[in-house]
Curated annotation (Swiss-Prot):
Reaction equations catalysed: succinate + ATP + CoA = succinyl-CoA + ADP + phosphate; GTP + succinate + CoA = succinyl-CoA + GDP + phosphate
Broadest EC class assigned to this enzyme: ligase
Organism phylogeny: Bacteria, Pseudomonadati, Pseudomonadota, Gammaproteobacteria, Alteromonadales
Keyword terms: ATP-binding, Ligase, Magnesium, Metal-binding, Nucleotide-binding, Tricarboxylic acid cycle
Source organism per UniProt: Shewanella sp. (strain W3-18-1)
Protein name: Succinate--CoA ligase [ADP-forming] subunit beta
Length: 388
């Protein structure tokens, strides 16, 4: 689950981190009034969506005119903002963040993720602020400095100082950076973050550190114990199909191909997508129906997959372990009849009662293609998607 910038900054403020005074507004009039409450003669107004690249897409504006703030809010509220990180539809803008303007002397990067290889929270800092960290990692990885947090001892001030020295901070800035680092590390664990970014973390013209932006991703598996953060969820930013899938405990991620994939198990699902790619196809989705692939869940999975008009064929790849393949086959048949599937369906069954499952499919009288292996299934579904 992701948070908006204004939500991230509200958490930053709770932990004593330096952020701009700002207000998230629902209407143009609120935005104008927010500028008046902030004071000064220069403000920054930002569209609030779960995507980067807002500035280049016209979703960020610096202005000293309150009427320009009104016009900006009237233009964007209720519309979709399209950036390089969204699809062609973009994401809806329901709030505008109005903030005081910050004079910038330099831009840094500070972020943290859960590193699965070390099984630790890893902080990353760089002098290349304001730039996509992925680009820095690819082109100049030596400019990214890391600190690994030991879960037994927690974050240590010396780790912050080590990063601060590498960023070239002066003694005053070092103290500020240490406070920011310790606050972020504590916040990361307290709220079960999966991702945290301040890009940029700026040095102002007065020489102080300031959190100019904020990006936070929460571990969805931990939301049951994070009611405060869970309440910040903005469903308007979710893909409609992904949100519908979650209601049925289906793990679905929309992609841009034409081969729908329905698989039980995340690892098998990724392997299925890989082999479809290997044979020249493009997966339209990642969909893991999990271990309890009942008729109802399979039917909903078909509905979700087929709600994508780009899908020209569907590959069902099931490994029967706890779940018997003959039961899965009956579920597939029932789902195909219920949904009225009009695209080719290729089914590969392996594991418990796989042969019986294939017999059930063969006797159904439906236009279901039973594959003999995963390679055979991939070849057949790619050809079917191409109309061959």
């Amino acid at each position: 689950m992701n948070l908006h910038e204004y939500q991230a900054k509200s958490l930053f403020a709770e932990y004593g981190l330096p952020v701009s005074e700002g207000f998230a507004c629902d209407t143009a009039q609120e935005a104008v009034e927010a500028a008046g409450r902030i004071g000064g003669n220069l403000w920054v107004v930002k569209c609030q969506v779960h995507a980067g690249g807002r500035g280049k897409a016209g979703g960020v504006k610096v202005t000293g005119d309150k009427e320009e703030i009104r016009a900006f809010a009237e233009h964007w509220l209720g519309k979709n903002l399209v950036t390089y990180q969204t699809d062609e539809k973009g994401q809806p803008v329901a709030k505008i963040l109005v903030e005081s303007c910050t004079d910038i002397a330099n831009e840094l990067y500070l972020g943290a993720v859960v590193d699965r290889s070390t099984r630790r929270v890893v902080f990353m800092a760089s002098t290349e602020g304001g730039v996509e960290i992925e680009k820095v990692a690819e082109e100049t990885p030596e400019l990214i400095h890391k600190a690994i947090i030991d879960p037994l001892t927690g974050p240590q001030p010396y780790q912050a100082r080590d990063l601060g020295f590498k960023l070239g901070l002066n003694p005053t800035q070092m103290k500020q950076f240490t406070k920011i680092f310790m606050g972020l590390a504590t916040m990361f664990v307290d709220h079960d973050f999966a991702l945290l970014e301040i890009n940029p973390l700026v040095i102002t013209t007065e020489g102080n550190l300031h959190c100019l932006d904020g990006k936070i991703g929460i571990d969805g598996n931990a939301l049951f114990r994070q009611p405060k953060v869970k309440a910040m969820h903005d469903p308007s930013q979710d893909d409609a199909r992904e949100a519908h899938a979650a209601m049925f405990e289906l793990n679905y991620v929309a992609l841009d191909g034409n081969v729908g994939c329905m698989v039980n198990g995340a690892g098998l699902a990724m392997g299925t997508m890989d082999i479809v790619n290997l044979h020249g196809g493009k997966p339209a989705n990642f969909l893991d129906v999990g271990g309890g692939a009942t008729k109802e869940r399979v039917a909903e999975a078909f509905k979700i997959i087929l709600s994508d008009s780009n899908v020209k064929a569907v590959l069902v790849n099931i490994f029967g372990g706890i779940v018997r393949c003959d039961m899965i086959a009956e579920g597939i048949i029932g789902a195909v009849k219920e949904v009225g599937v009009k695209v080719p369906v290729v089914v590969r069954l392996e594991g418990t009662n796989a042969e019986l499952g294939r017999e059930v499919l063969a006797k159904s009288g439906l236009d279901i293609i039973a594959a003999t292996s995963l390679t055979d299934a991939a070849e057949r579904v790619v050809k079917a998607a191409e109309g061959k």
